[in-house]
Amino acid sequence: MNEVSYKEISNEEEGQRLDNYLIRILKGVPKSHIYRIIRGGEVRVNKKRAQVSSRLHAGDSIRIPPIRL
């Protein structure tokens, strides 16, 4: 991923933790990198910094930064 992307949470994805959701959609990205970008405030949920253990709700907008490994 070379650019910022936005994902909207569907009813089927509701209730998942943010870290588990990102691990599932960002295949090939190490878990340690995913945790680092969440803790660093680069991942936003509804334009706010999110915690690793945040639960997602239907309609939430997730901002995912460019992934550089």
Indicate where each model-derived feature is located.
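S4-like RNA-binding module at protein N-termini
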Residues: M1-L69
